[in-house]
């Protein structure tokens, strides 16, 4: 479990542009990242658009807390250099048990978060939110879990490549479990009003 996250842990690698994750640096090109990760990296024929960035290289089945995640190397559309790293669990696998394992693994690696919040949904069309943020040495690590609130059982609850998690969760609204690593000051803070 911590083997994969051990690569996330501070202190940051030498150099002002270090991301603090697996010896990567802000501004690296897809080609440089591809050389670093070799066969573990998958080049995408069609890049995924993230608005201000795109991902044309991913790592599949990256272990966080004992579960497989996908790592998206988000490249700046203007400079084509590494802008942020997003580590995301597939939507059907983004369930409370997996979220708890991921948050526990992050706390084991980084210690207590700098900022944390939890907001429970109070209406049928809202989503509950759990967010934890670590800020160190010019880098922000943000873990976010949005859970749907409709009280219906999804029969395909947590089916994902390589594992199956049982339990109950809401269905109807898309769930989300992700970890974003970015330069400090570049990430939105859903917890801002509740600090």
Regions picked out by a protein language model, each given a short descriptive name:
Residues 1-6:
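Bacterial N-terminal signal peptides that target proteins for export
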Residues 57-102:
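Mid-chain, structured segments of secreted extracytoplasmic proteins
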Residues 16-53, 88-195:
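Non-cytosolic coordination micro-motifs
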Residues 9-14:
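N-terminal signal peptide c-region/cleavage motif recognized by signal peptidases
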Residues 8, 56-59, 118:
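Short secondary-structure boundary micro-motifs
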